[in-house]
Structures are given as C-alpha cells and as structure tokens.
Amino acid sequence: SSKLHFSDIDFGESETQRIYGAHINYGIKRVEWLESNIGLLDLRVFPPLRLGGASLISALSLLENTRALVIDLRHNGGGHGEAVSLIASFLVDDIRPLSGVYSRPLDLLTSNQTYPYTLGKPYGKDKPVYVLISRETFSAAEALAYDLQALGRVTVVGETSGGGANPFEYKRIHPQFVLWSVTEK
C-alpha cells in the first residue's frame, strides 16, 4: 500500500523528501482520461511546490481538454497549503480568496488566494469539477475541498472529511513518541 503512516516518518533531514518525494510521484497516484472525456486526478498528498509543483502542473495540464474533472482526495492526508493554491488556480479564471490561517504564537492572520497565473493552461471556471472525499481526507486536502466548494466551483461528493485543516508542529520527544501541537487555525 502507498498509504503513509506516521510510523514511516523518521523526522530527520530527509523527512520532506520521504513524505512528498519522487518515490511516491509527489502524491499523484493516477491521472486518467475516463470514458465520455472525463478527467480523473487521484492525489494522495499535497507536496511542497519546490518538490512536486512541476508534476502537479503536468498532471493538471494533461486533463485540460476534458469536459469534466473528478479530483479524488478520498485517501489524501494533506500536505502543503501552497499546493491547494496551485490546484485552485487551475480551476478559476481570476485571483480568488481561499481560507486563511491564524497563527496563535504570532497573533497573525495570513490570507491565502489563488495565483494570478498558472504555468499551464487553466482548466477554466465553466467545466464541471467534482471532488471526492472520505473520512481519510484530511488537512490540506480538506482545505482544497472546502475552499473550492465555498467558491461555488466544485461539487463535493462523499463522506464527512477527517478534519484537521489546521497547521501543526511536531517534536520527537522519545524514539517512540511524537508530540503534535496545533499552532494555527
């Protein structure tokens, strides 16, 4: 199974590469043209753009000429919010606000938005897009589904998501224990 478990994380220098790297295709499980010219994009994790941005752009660009798009986030545990902005940017025609993040330690609200341009042809605002979610949909994956639904851009289909659309920090406090602390909401 390609599902990531926290026990697989070594929390060392190579952590980001291990979680989001090429060995898991930067979270892109499947890109497919289905019958009736429907595009399918199955994403398992949202990589930092410095690692997986080019792969995300390529995947989205491969589906640009489909008549409808299904984004499968049912097994996506989240990842980097900048990937949310990138994906959302392909699905709208202008800069749009996305959910923000409030930092408790800094007492600072950071607003997120779609990017003013994409490095591929945008999918556009008129073709139907469906986002599949499940209780395994978590963190940044939940944020993408929520943001696009709030913009009226997608139809969300599935179960109630797992939640967790808030950034956190973690510290290894023992070889067998990790402390996860939500720092933003």
Regions found by a protein language model. Give the residues of each.
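Active-site-proximal beta-strand/loop segments in catalytic clefts of secreted hydrolases
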Residues: 43-46, 72-75, 103, 132-136, ...
